[in-house]
């Protein structure tokens, strides 16, 4: 199913944090703790702004939303927060 990509991305990012390879996301998460966190938060802010700016064009909105979701998942993986915690929160809000 299409929604499985969220877990696949999360699992890949956790693996890249624990077993760094030569990739942008691995390097981002392997920086010194404070520097890595600051860079991830900066990227999240940038992507959130881009989603807002792209909201008048559906194609741009889809692209920028994917970026924001990716970096949100990256932040969760970096902080060691299980994806199921987010799913549980969404379920509790839906009920």
Swiss-Prot record:
It catalyses: 1-(5-phospho-beta-D-ribosyl)-ATP + H2O = 1-(5-phospho-beta-D-ribosyl)-5'-AMP + diphosphate + H(+). It is found in: Cytoplasm. Keywords: Amino-acid biosynthesis, ATP-binding, Cytoplasm, Histidine biosynthesis, Hydrolase, Nucleotide-binding. Its EC number is 3.6.1.31. GO terms for cellular component: cytoplasm. The keyword Hydrolase applies. Disulfide bonds: none annotated. Pfam families: PRA-PH. One of its GO terms (molecular function) is phosphoribosyl-ATP diphosphatase activity. Its main location: cytoplasm. It comes from the Archaea. CDD domains: NTP-PPase_HisIE_like (cd11534). The keyword Lipoprotein does not apply. GO terms for biological process: L-histidine biosynthetic process. Belongs to the PRA-PH family. This is Phosphoribosyl-ATP pyrophosphatase.
């Amino acid at each position: 199913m299409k929604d499985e990509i969220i877990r696949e991305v999360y699992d890949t990012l956790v693996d890249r944090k624990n077993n760094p390879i030569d990739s942008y996301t691995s390097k981002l998460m392997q920086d010194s703790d404070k520097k890595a966190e600051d860079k991830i938060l900066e990227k999240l802010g940038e992507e959130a702004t881009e989603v807002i700016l792209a909201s008048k064009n559906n194609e741009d909105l889809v692209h920028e939303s994917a970026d924001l979701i990716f970096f949100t998942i990256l932040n969760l993986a970096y902080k060691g927060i299980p994806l199921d915690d987010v799913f549980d929160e969404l379920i509790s809000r839906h009920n």
